[in-house]
Swiss-Prot record:
It comes from the Eukaryota. The chain crosses the membrane at residues 1096-1116. This is Immunoglobulin superfamily member 3. Residues 21-1095 are extracellular.
Length: 1165
């Protein structure tokens, strides 16, 4: 038990570490809130599974019924709320705000007294299993609102510089520990400003706009008594006027330590007006004009309109585009920032105070970047109680925009090129002309830029205003070697020269010229820039480079001559090198190889595979140096093929090296060298020969004409079978005799004979024709001649007409019985199927026979047994799946008579059911003594049905109705009235359907066909006994019965039969209801038994009374009649009297027999 508990605890710990646990959290309580205020309670869930958006259900448990849940509001079902809250939910007084998928807030806008209670937040389960917490609770207390805030409404008129006092009554009467905070507010122009506050922590805090005044003591707050608070303002200013309110707030500390405002109230306002003294002032900003040129001077004046300016303190700040550039103290001391401080040092900018009311900003040398908006801000300052300056009021006028126009140049630039299209390698020259300079003091700088065809731009070369020249990164090497030059002619011309122009020099050339003038600070100022462009295209040397090959004699005969010409275009200057190579590809195929090459220096070099071309070819170069001719004599097949001219273009570099620019290949010239026209003719006569196997066949081949008297001939004999597309070589005759592959395959070597009966007449004789020799035969003649290279070549070939040979075999005449039959057999018996050969092709032919079957449930055919032509019996492949083992031993093949074959199968099984037939093959002997299959035929099908015995199991259906007392016993009989076969075996199963309603059927006892009992339920263990009184009678004895044994008892019998292979299978089963058994308790056994049975009732309560009465009367009469003469205690003749000692009732345990009343002898006292 301890081990099991440990394993269970370990499993729970493992599950806890591997499964996520849902956890619901709610805001910590208890919380105290005032009646009429609003509240928000948060709730979240974590560790859940399922969708990311969880639902939240809020309920309340009222103090009056702490166990009763009242549904308030939820996120999933609008009808979740109970009637007491549904109206407030619909009106929006109570609602749930979803912060995220697993976080929500419950809002109650106006708390009521009945809202106090225990709040529960519940999240419905979305996990596969229940694991963790699904709800959390907190308490809310709603307390009365006892806060009071009051201040008399009044209107006060004050003068600037005066003082002000206002009082306010703030009190509370709460049963909880709360704190009060008091704030004074001023409302002016719709805006609310905090003056001063006493926080719940009893600290004083001034508002942002009154922090300065509070620091100097002009604002203070005093507490008079328990609930009176007084505000005092000194040194009033017009900005202090407005409506002043007192705000009281009651605070309570929540369990998490934070302070929460229970309630807040505001008093009526006190209207305050502060009459200002005459201290107003205005500001103006002036300038002479708003548009200037670069280098001009601009002056801006900031003018103050005020009373007694000499006695007042004004500070001025200057701004450009809203950025501070300078400031002046009331004493006129300037302070400039950033770049303007540097310009002040150089004397370009000055800030001054012209008078008490005029402040100026002067810029002596304007720049274009000085364009923008200028402004000044005037701030009046006053001295505080401690002597420090305090900003009183600040004003600024409207912005003044100033535009500074830059100086413009009047340059004009033009670019010209020596040519818009330049051949690669030729010098490129461009000229940039400049006109209309600003004056003698101005200087110019120039730069050349190139934009290629891809739109990429790069700098070529540059010369600054001092005449210093440098090249771009990609042109520095060419500048150093002198290929790149920038030449300035006078003061207005810049020439760009590029020696050995390259393809990359193609593009748009831009000349950029900048004009500079001296600035006031000694530097040079850019006055303007102009540019012009010119497009230059550098034509590659290979542009238009082409090679063409021509010939006048594309076709020649043996021993003729032919010429080939290679033409180059265009004409190039001498410094351009050209090399030419003739290439050749033989007509018979193979790789193209070089024949001869003219180098750019004029040398001639033959290729390694030139071969015979050297002895019969002449190479010439034309006077124009652009034509190369190749002449070939004594043409043969070796010179037939495709010729091609390949030219290479080279350029001499300034470094002293050659660079290959291009390679061009000409068109292909095919030279055909023709052989003599053949005049070979072979006889085309066609014949058809039909012979019988073993006969001799003679074929002939005749040449009618030939090309020349010196021709030689080779004769090839072919055979083409009807199913073949191409002929197969049999034999070849030339100077000797060569057998083809077909002669080997068809064993023709020993049966062939070749003869030349006359010049041009050839014969082929075939001895002992076979059936396989059938087909079409023909000869093919090859004519051979000698070429110019003294080599024999095949000049022509021609085939003769077809001779069709048909070698006959006897016609097939095999016939079998095709009548279908049906055979039926019981399992374990045998059946026989027959195969009858009605006719055959030849009497001496041989037969082979194969028995086939198609068993039920199997689509494929199976071969059972085969009888060869030699009479050998061979078993078929019957080891397939689901085939009964031992099948070969059960089969027997016999031949009862000539042409009749039989297959007998013993010990049949149901699996043997199927279709049976025989397949017969007829074999004949050919001339070579070999047996070959002539034909085959399949007999008609015989359907065999193997069936099991018909089931005949039946049980007796007599029913019993028995009542008996608790503790008794009863017997049940299961009678088999009929069975299928005497040798079958029976299995018995007893079951009980209990008397209680809904009880399931219970198996009491299972006894298999061998008499082995199956394990029983614990309550039946040792109580049941089964007896087999006969082969068909089974009795179940049940002792010590109880009330739980009441119900319907059923007997189930299974009949098992042994199959041919010794295996037992279930043939039939039958179930019978035996009867109803009622078991009664002992407490009410006599009364209930008698009352439940009519026979017992009359036997006990009716029949005994008259019987007892008659017996008593008879005994008394006899006793009194014989008393004087008899002995005491004796009857007549000394026999003792009978006395009724006690009547006995014997009850049958099964209550099937009426009780028996018996009288026992006794003594009379």
């Amino acid at each position: 038990m301890g081990t099991a508990a440990g394993l269970l605890l370990a499993a729970l710990l493992l599950a806890g570490t591997s499964w996520a646990q849902r956890e619901v959290n709610i805001q910590q309580g208890p919380l105290y809130r005032a009646e009429g205020s609003q509240i928000s309670i948060w709730c979240n869930v974590r560790g859940y599974q399922g969708p990311s958006e969880q639902n939240f259900l809020w309920s309340i448990y009222l103090p009056s019924a702490p166990e009763k849940e009242i549904q308030m509001v939820g996120t999933s079902d609008p009808s979740f709320s109970y009637a007491i809250y549904s109206q407030r939910v619909r009106s929006g007084d109570i609602y749930v705000e979803r912060v995220s998928g697993d976080h929500a807030l419950l809002h109650i806008r106006q708390l009521q007294e009945q809202d106090a209670g225990e709040y529960e937040c519940h999240t419905p389960n979305t996990d596969p299993t229940y694991h963790g917490s699904y709800s959390a609770k907190m308490n809310l207390h709603v307390i009365p609102d006892t806060l009071t805030v009051s201040s008399p409404a009044q209107t006060l008129q004050k003068v600037e510089g005066g003082s002000l006092q206002v009082t306010c009554e703030v009190s509370q009467n709460s049963s909880q520990h709360t704190h009060l905070s008091v704030s004074w507010l001023r409302i002016s122009g719709g805006e609310e400003h905090e003056i001063i506050s006493l926080t719940q922590n009893l600290s004083v805090r001034a508002g942002p706009t009154y922090a300065q005044k509070h620091s100097v003591g002009d604002v203070r707050m005093d507490k008079l008594g328990d609930s009176t608070f007084r505000l005092t303002l000194y040194n009033l200013h017009p900005s202090d006027q407005g409506e002043i309110h007192c705000v009281g707030t009651e605070w309570i500390q929540d369990p998490d330590g934070t302070w929460f405002p229970l309630t807040q109230k505001r008093s009526e306002g006190t209207s305050v007006t502060v009459q200002p003294t005459d201290k107003e002032f205005n500001v103006r900003l002036e300038t002479e004009r708003r548009t200037y040129g670069a280098g001009d001077m601009a002056s801006l004046r900031c003018i103050i309109d005020a009373q007694n300016p000499a006695e007042r303190l004004f500070a001025v700040s200057w701004a450009f585009n809203s950025s501070l550039i300078a400031s002046q103290s009331p004493g006129g001391v300037p302070s400039l920032t950033g770049e303007y401080a540097k310009r002040e040092d150089r004397g370009e900018v000055r800030v001054g105070k012209d008078s008490d009311i005029v402040f100026s900003l002067k810029i002596f040398h304007l720049r274009p970047e000085d364009s923008g908006k200028y402004n000044c801000r005037v701030t009046e300052r006053e001295r505080g109680p401690s002597g420090e300056l305090i900003d009183r009021e600040s004003k600024r006028p409207k912005n003044i925009p100033i535009s500074v126009l830059p100086l413009r140049t009047s340059l004009t630039v033009t670019v010209t090129a020596n040519s818009s299209s330049v051949l690669e390698g030729v010098r490129l020259s461009l000229t940039c002309s400049v006109a209309s300079l600003a004056g003698p003091q101005s200087r110019i700088s120039a730069s050349w830029h190139l934009q290629d065809k891809q739109g990429r731009q790069r700098e070529v070369v540059r010369q600054d205003r001092d005449g210093v020249t440098w090249a771009g990164e990609q042109y520095r090497e060419r500048l150093g070697t002198g290929e790149l030059r920038l030449i300035r002619s006078g003061s207005d011309t810049f020439s760009l020269e590029l020696e050995g122009s390259q393809r990359t020099d193609t593009g748009s050339y831009e000349c950029r010229v900048a004009e500079w003038v001296p600035a006031t600070d000694g530097e040079w100022q850019l006055l303007g820039e102009r540019s012009a462009q010119a497009n230059v295209d550098i034509m590659a040397l290979e542009t238009g480079f082409a090679v063409t090959a021509i010939t006048r004699t594309p076709g020649v005969s043996y021993f003729d001559s032919f010429d080939l010409q290679c033409i180059l275009k265009p004409h190039y200057p001498p410094w351009v090198g050209v090399s030419v190579t003739w290439r050749f590809q033989p007509a018979g195929g193979g790789d193209t190889h070089d024949l001869v090459t003219f180098s750019r220096a004029g040398g001639v070099q033959w290729g390694e595979r030139a071969g015979s071309f050297r002895g019969r070819s002449v190479v010439e170069k034309g006077d124009s140096t652009h034509t190369v001719k190749l002449s070939v004599s004594r043409a043969s097949d070796s010179e037939a093929g495709k010729y091609q001219c390949v030219a290479e273009l080279w350029r001499w570099e300034y470094r002293g090296t050659w660079t290959q620019l291009a390679e061009r290949a000409s068109n292909l010239l095919e030279i055909r060298v023709q052989r003599p026209v053949p005049r070979l003719q072979v006889s085309k006569v066609t014949r058809t020969l039909s012979v019988v196997e073993g006969s001799q066949v003679t074929l002939s081949c005749s040449i009618r004409s030939q090309t020349g008297p010196d021709s030689r001939f080779a004769v090839l004999w072919f055979m083409r079978q009807p199913s073949g597309a191409d002929g197969k070589l049999i034999v070849r005759s030339n100077t000797g005799m060569e057998y083809g592959t077909y002669a080997e395959e068809a064993s023709l070597k020993g049966r062939l004979q070749l003869e030349v009966t006359a010049p041009g007449h050839y014969t082929l004789t075939l001895q002992g024709a076979h059936a396989d020799d059938s087909g079409s035969y023909y000869c093919q003649v090859e004519e051979w001649a000698m070429d110019p290279n003294q080599a024999w070549y095949r000049l022509a070939e021609e085939a003769s007409g077809m001779t069709e040979i048909r070698v006959r075999v006897p016609d097939a005449n095999l016939q079998l019985d095709q009548i279908p039959r049906n055979v039926s057999a019981l399992e374990g018996q045998s059946f026989t199927v027959t195969c009858h050969v009605l006719n055959r092709t030849l009497p001496d032919s041989r037969l082979s026979l194969e028995w086939l079957s198609w068993w039920a449930g199997h689509m494929e055919r199976r071969a059972l047994v085969r009888l060869t032509v030699d009479g050998v019996t061979i078993l078929g492949s019957v080891e397939e799946e689901n085939v009964a083992p031992g099948l070969p031993s059960r089969m027997q093949v016999s031949q009862p008579s000539l042409g009749l074959y039989a297959l007998t199968l013993r010990g049949t099984e149901v699996q043997d059911t199927g279709t049976y037939s025989c397949l017969v093959q007829e074999w004949l002997q050919d001339p070579r003594g070999q047996w070959y299959k002539r034909t085959e035929e399949r007999s008609g099908a015989t359907y065999v049905s193997v069936r099991q015995p018909d089931p005949a199991l039946q049980l007796d259906s007599s029913l019993l109705n028995v009542s008996l007392m608790e503790g008794g016993h009863f017997d049940l009989d299961c009678v088999v009235s009929s069975r299928s076969r005497p040798d079958s075996q029976l299995a018995i199963s007893w079951s009980l359907q209990g008397a209680s309603r809904g009880a399931e059927q219970e198996t009491l006892l299972n006894v298999d066909r061998s008499g082995v009992w199956a394990p029983m339920a614990p309550r039946w263990e040792g109580r049941l006994q089964q007896l087999q009184l006969s082969p068909t009678l089974f009795r179940l004895h049940v002792p010590r019965v109880g009330q739980g044994d009441s119900g319907n008892y059923t007997c189930l019998v299974q009949e098992w039969l042994q199959g041919p292979r010794g295996n037992w299978y279930l043939l039939a089963q039958d179930e019978s209801l035996i009867g109803w058994i009622r078991v009664q308790s002992k407490e009410s056994n006599l009364q209930s038994t008698i009352c439940a049975n009519d026979a017992l009732f009359y036997l006990v309560f009716f029949y005994p009374f008259p019987i007892f009465g008659i017996l008593i009367i008879t005994i008394l009469l006899v006793r009194f009649r014989h008393r004087p003469t008899s002995k005491p205690g004796e009857g007549k003749n000394g026999v003792p009297l009978l006395w009724i000692k006690e009547p006995h009732l014997n009850y049958s345990p099964t209550c099937l027999e009426p009780p028996v009343l018996s009288i026992h002898p006794g003594t009379i006292d």
